[in-house]
Each structure stands twice: as structure tokens, then as C-alpha cells.
Amino acid sequence: MSAVLVVNSGSSSLKYQLIDAKSEEALATGLIERVGEGEGRIRHRGPGGSAEYTLVIPDHTAAFRAMLAAFGTDGSSLVEHPLDAVGHRVVHGGKRFFEPTIVTPLVEANIDDLADLAPLHNPANLDGIRAARQAFPAVPHVAVFDTAFHQTLEPAAYTYAIDAALAEEHRVRRYGFHGTSHKYVSGAVAELLGRPLGELKQIVLHLGNGASACAVDGGRSIDTSMGMTPLEGLVMGTRSGDIDPAVLFHLSRRAGLGIDELDELLNRRSGLLGLTGHGDMRDVRRVAESGDAVARLALDTVAHRLKHYIGAYTALLGGLDALTFTAGVGENDPDLRAAACKGLGVLGIQLDPERNAARSPGARIVSADGSPVTVLVVPTNEELEIARQALQAVAAG
């Protein structure tokens, strides 16, 4: 029985999943935290059950050794499940990578060269790739880029209206993120509706602590809310989303904030956290339900921004067949879905209150019978999408 190992390597973490290449079943999952921070923590779940323990993990190479040891003790030994590929999540592929790519030394060098576009992610992704290639030297390794799905954007969609030569020199343009999720979900919607992907006009809302919207026309991304970085777009847990750039000049002059302080403000101290002191949507909703006006305003701001993108993308698509909510908040917050869809009957979006309120772990339709636009909740599965793309890359050679 062959399998694909999917790896998501963060700066101090290693998340992994072993997926059966034929059944697409998750055979084992795990998370290793606090890599390089002294005593690390391992959580592993496989056929033999679940385990959680601590271990000194100085670097990603040690994290892979710990992962192999966990596989060896839970009944999902990689000897019994030989690997067809190792699929790696890489956040930023710039404009160089538009498809899953078999890792070579040149590919590693290119990922490293793009680190200035994703300084918090690409170096950690590359550490994981190098450690994995050392652990599995005979297995093909495939990089799957979050930005790749958005390489189909037209120049009018990805161009910022600034000095063209300066933008070209410093690689300033819209790249978009969450592409692996948007690709998976848009495909799952077509399957659920029993319609060809190529004929569907879709909007996918990936709503977690990070959040993005994507307009998908016939399976192709034509616009997305995140930009050169994941900061642009929707209101998020700790990120501001769209903001007038002149606000930064104003805060620099009047509050004396430097570049690094402004970066910290917009990426880590804004969004829900900045508005309410809570970065988790569940906490914000709990406080709002107790009568807190500031928390209520934050929820209204989130919904307002969602409506803004739903309307804009419906216009860009020239109509809409399906609106889909996914990721942690999108899948589990019926009140936000209701607020985002309220008043959008003019666009053909009609939510069914009972269907929307019903709790279910699976993919489901939550729009009313007769709604011109089908509204869905579809759980994302980025690991499975990475596994699929890794196998496709290996098969293509």
C-alpha cells in the first residue's frame, strides 16, 4: 500500500499527514511544536491510537527523526506504507512557480530567493524540505505553492498602480494566498453539485484566523483578496485587511511609529484583536452576545467587508453559480454566514435559516430551495489537495 507524506513546515513547527495514495484516507496525522525552542511537544495519531509527549527537538532534522519514530510505534510504519512522494506546502512561489514542482537544488535556490516576499514562511518551508530530503533521499519531493492557483490572474487583476519600473524591480504585484484551499474547495463544489467545474462561476470564502476571498471562473482564479502579502483584503484575526496606505504615513508622523512597528501593528495587532482585544472569532461573538457594542461593531465590520468582496466578484464573474464558506470560521459560524448573505437577494443569494443553523461536519448546501445562487459550506482539505498535486507532478515526471 503506497502513500504520500504531506508536510507543512513552520518556523517552529512541523505538521504532517500520511495519506493513502489510492483511497485518499488519512492514515496518520501529527504536529510537532516548539522546534528549536528547547523542549518540543509531539502529538501523533495513527492506527495504533494517539500519543502526546515532549522531547528535545533542536531543528527540523531532529523533528523529522521524531516523526519517523512516532510512525514506527503506532502501526503506520513507513516501511508498510512506502512513499510515492513527499508533498511540501510552500507559501510563496512568486511568479516563477505556477504548478506543483519536483524539488531540485535549483528549485530550493529559487524558494530561498523568494524569501523576501514571505520572510516568515519560505525559510521555514525550505528548512522542512531540506530535512525531508535528508530523511527520504530516494523519494520524489514536490513543492506545492499557495500562490500557484492564482497565476491565472490577468495583469489588470494583479497589477498595482504604482511606478511600473519600481514594481518590476522589487516584484511588487498581487500574488494571492490560500490557493491550495481555494483549488480544493472549488473542485469539491463542482463534484457536490454534479456539474462540470469548467462551467461554474464561484466565490470561495476561506475564513479562518487568516481569511481570503477568491473569484473562480471555470476552475481558474480570476481575482483574490490577498495581495503581495497575506495582509490585504478581508478583516482577519490579527490582520487589518484593506486599509488606506496613507494611514501608515499619518501614524508614522503623528504617533512616531517606525516601519517595523507599523508592520507589527497591521499584521499582529489589528483585525479582530485590534478592534476588541480578542483575536478569536468565537471570543468576539461571545462578548458581542453579552451586549458589548465594540464587539458588535467588529462583527459588523467583518460582514461588511465580506459583502464588499461578494458583490465585486459577482460583477467580475458576470454572474454567480455558487458561494462557498470554508475553513474554521467559515465552516463553523452560521451567524457570520447569515450576516454576510443578508440583503444579497439582489444578487440571487438566498440563505435557508434552518439549513444554515444546522451543525454538520460534512459538505452541505445551506441556500434556500429556488435560490439562484447555491450557497454551500465545504470543509477544506489542503493536505489532500497537496497529496493529489504531488502525485500528479510525479506522474508527469
UniProtKB/Swiss-Prot annotation:
Pfam family, one: Acetate_kinase
An example Gene Ontology CC term for this record: cytoplasm
Location of the active site: D146
Main localization, broad class: cytoplasm
Pathways involved: Metabolic intermediate biosynthesis; acetyl-CoA biosynthesis; acetyl-CoA from acetate: step 1/2
Positions that bind ATP: K15, H206, L207, G208, N209, G210, D280, M281, R282, G328, V329, G330, E331, N332
Transmembrane stretches, start-end: none
Binding site for Mg(2+): N8, E382
Substrates-to-products reaction catalysed: acetate + ATP = acetyl phosphate + ADP
Cofactors, names only: Mg(2+); Mn(2+)
SUPFAM superfamilies: Actin-like ATPase domain
Alphabetic keyword roster: ATP-binding, Cytoplasm, Kinase, Magnesium, Metal-binding, Nucleotide-binding, Transferase
Positions bound to substrate: R89
Subunit structure, interactors included: Homodimer.
Function: Catalyzes the formation of acetyl phosphate from acetate and ATP. Can also catalyze the reverse reaction.
Family per record: Belongs to the acetokinase family.
Name of protein: Acetate kinase
Organism: Leifsonia xyli subsp. xyli (strain CTCB07)
Lineage, uppermost ranks: Bacteria, Bacillati, Actinomycetota, Actinomycetes, Micrococcales
Primary gene name: ackA
